[in-house]
């Protein structure tokens, strides 16, 4: 079975051609392939499939085998994958995800895709739709205590749940420990991704992310979008900013006119290979 390892801002996934026959148990396949000691090593797998009403459809599985709604960085890499491999000649694509239809614009240079912009859609602020177990309609700067640490959280869904926390000095905190506790907190019936954000300026935000089902990763596209939305809601940032992640930078814009969030960043092919292991 052929695979392609790709990364966007350090968010690395294994990409599989779903137009060809694949193993039935994709959850187990993701656990095996994603293992960084006994497999290829990745944040998960992404399967590119035919769609009845879009150019392509994606399914993605985290490293622990759980299926996720979508991933912004992965959607950019899908744009590069399908164009560079000749599955399409279009530079504007529609992508079907469990979080709805996403629109991709490909920046092609010398016959290959270098950067991709994604229309990530409208942010969801309604607490029941994120979802969050609360009687409140929205969670904006909501006080939450985690092991004697008091945080103010803002919850946003970009098709998947995110909890954003603003910190002045990230290095003071054990983000792995705190991230895991918040991910599994009773407030979040479907668990949550957790973003830790430090405001460098209204146009530059530093972010680290604890991803649901994976742990800390170098980047998260939907998390970067949710972080900018949360920063704007809390009066900490402009509607267009650069998000500085461990794996690289993403340009994020929350458009005031149409309420949609746009993400732009690189998409990189790391290597390709053949997977011969049984699941």
Where are these regions (language model features)?
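N-terminal, positively charged, Ser/Thr/Ala/Gly-biased leader segments
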Residues: 1-21, 118, 135-136, 141-156
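Membrane helix-loop-helix hairpins that form the core translocation module of multi-pass transporters
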Residues: 115-117, 121-123
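A glycine-rich beta-to-alpha transition motif near the start of alpha/beta enzyme domains, typified by
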Residues: 1-112, 163-279
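Generic structural detector for well-ordered beta-strands
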Residues: 105, 119, 131, 143-145, ...
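Short, charged/polar, Gly/Pro-enriched secondary-structure boundary elements
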Residues: 124-128
């Amino acid at each position: 079975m052929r695979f392609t390892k790709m990364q966007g801002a350090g968010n690395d996934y294994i990409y599989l051609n779903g137009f060809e026959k694949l193993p039935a148990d994709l959850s187990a396949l993701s656990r095996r392939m994603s293992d960084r000691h006994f497999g290829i090593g990745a944040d998960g797998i992404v399967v590119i499939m035919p769609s009845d009403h879009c150019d392509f459809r994606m399914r993605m599985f985290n490293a622990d085998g759980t299926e996720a709604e979508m991933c912004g960085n992965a959607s950019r890499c899908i744009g590069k994958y399908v164009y560079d491999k000749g599955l399409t000649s279009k530079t504007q694509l529609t992508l079907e995800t469990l979080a709805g239809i996403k629109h991709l614009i490909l920046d092609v240079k010398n016959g290959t895709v270098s950067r991709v912009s994604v229309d990530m859609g409208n942010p969801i602020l309604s607490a029941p739709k994120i979802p969050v177990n609360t009687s409140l309609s929205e969670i904006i700067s909501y006080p939450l205590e985690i092991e004697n640490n008091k945080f103010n959280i803002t919850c946003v869904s970009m098709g998947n749940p995110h909890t954003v926390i603003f910190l002045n000095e990230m290095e003071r905190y054990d983000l792995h420990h705190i991230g895991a506790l918040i991910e599994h907190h009773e407030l979040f019936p479907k668990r949550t991704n957790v973003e830790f954000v430090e405001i460098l300026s209204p146009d530059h935000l530093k972010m680290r992310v604890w991803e649901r089902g994976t742990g800390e990763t170098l980047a998260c596209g939907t998390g970067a979008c949710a972080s900018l939305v949360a920063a704007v809601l809390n009066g900490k940032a402009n509607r267009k900013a650069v998000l500085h992640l461990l794996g690289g930078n993403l340009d994020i814009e929350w458009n005031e006119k149409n309420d949609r969030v746009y993400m732009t960043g690189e998409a990189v092919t790391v290597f390709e290979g053949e997977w011969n292991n049984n699941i």
